């Protein structure tokens, strides 16, 4: 069951949530490889990192030939973004070869860089491929949704975060390992989660990759914090994403295995 199905009748429909996410990730061209990304107010004061990564990827993709799709990216968060101002994305065209293109994006807010992103694009062509084996985890229908898990601990969450935690979302998560938002117990830095959009996405591989980029930051911080016994809402870190060759549409549930190695000098 999705979060919106558990909420009141005044909450947006699942399709409205997904359409809203699509609009949020869309950037507006300003000329000279510059783009504007809109904000979504009503959160906890800062812009969600996955939103900035996804918008930066959309900007980079708009500066590449349409037959080339992103297959990997690296993003570095420099400063926290605020909800009050739009973000400007400046794209640098580093390389265009016979099959590959490389783009860099600097995301700026109020004249200061908040994120750097490097993305590689590949023309679809035959070649060797491999992937990791599917982990041995329960099926999504055998797991509770994240909204249900949040309701069970809502009384332990600081008042200022409760509305943000319980509002309906466009992406539904079903974590394999129980989420402990306020628990400081140390655990290995490995999590598994099933996720999907709560309604169909339009058939657009560029949008599908942007949604994957958006989702990639949703559980990363919590996974990195596990070995240190830290709770959520802390830290800076690097994100990396490899995009596979599959359409998402209404993502049949995808399994995200998220191991984290050495995170650097500090969280």
PLM regions: where:
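Terminal targeting signals and extreme-terminal segments of soluble enzymes
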Residues: 2-267
């Amino acid at each position: 069951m999705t979060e919106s199905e558990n909420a009141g009748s005044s909450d947006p429909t699942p399709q409205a949530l997904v359409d809203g996410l699509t609009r949020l990730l869309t950037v507006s061209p300003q000329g000279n490889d510059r783009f504007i990304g809109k904000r979504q107010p009503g959160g906890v004061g800062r812009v969600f990192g996955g939103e900035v990564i996804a918008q930066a990827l959309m900007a980079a993709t708009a500066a590449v030939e349409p037959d080339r799709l992103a297959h990997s990216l690296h993003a570095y968060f420099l400063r926290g973004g605020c909800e009050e101002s739009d973000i400007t994305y400046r794209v640098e065209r580093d390389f265009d070869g016979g099959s590959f293109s490389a783009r860099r994006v600097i995301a700026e807010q109020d004249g200061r860089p908040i994120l750097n992103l490097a993305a590689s694009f590949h023309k679809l062509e035959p070649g060797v491929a491999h992937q990791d084996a599917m982990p041995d985890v329960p099926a999504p229908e055998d797991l509770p949704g994240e909204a249900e898990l949040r309701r069970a601990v809502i009384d332990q969450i600081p008042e200022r975060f409760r509305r943000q935690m319980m509002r309906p979302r466009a992406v539904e998560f079903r974590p394999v390992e129980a989420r402990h938002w306020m628990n400081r117990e140390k655990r290995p830095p490995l999590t598994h989660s099933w996720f999907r959009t709560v309604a169909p996405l339009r058939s657009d591989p560029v949008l599908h990759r942007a949604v994957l980029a958006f989702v990639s930051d949703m559980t990363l911080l919590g996974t990195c914090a596990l070995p240190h016994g830290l709770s959520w809402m802390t830290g800076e870190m690097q994100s990396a994403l490899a995009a596979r060759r599959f359409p998402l549409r209404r993502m049949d549930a995808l399994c995200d295995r998220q191991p984290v190695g050495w995170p650097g000098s500090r969280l």
